[in-house]
Amino acid sequence: MKPLDNLCHPVSVIKDAEMLAAEAFGAKHAFFIVNGTTAAVQTMIFTSCKAGDKIIMPRNVHRSAINALVVCGAIPVYVNPGTNKQLGIPLGMSVKDVEKAIKENPDAKA
């Protein structure tokens, strides 16, 4: 049924939605993943890194990213996320810390 489309090979409404998402995010392409976040995270790492490549990531990264590093052999460059002192929860990486990691690791692939 063409109107319902197929996530594995979009040709109509899903393809249109992916194109709209890419436009909204200022990207060349956007792809909706079929197998959930773990597959999406691992796909991002597998497509951007190979054995020995450095990848900059937060120290509290999801275990799916760690598993991808083990499988592909990429080397993590960890950036410690900030912490919300009032709530005691981790925040994202600061722009300053990411810029520092990039300057210290200009050979990082991602």
Report each predicted region and the residues it spans.
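A glycine- and small-aliphatic-rich helix-loop capping segment at beta-alpha/alpha-beta transitions
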Residues: 47-51, 73-77, 99
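Short, acidic/turn-prone active-site loops that include or flank metal/cofactor-
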Residues: 60-62, 80-86
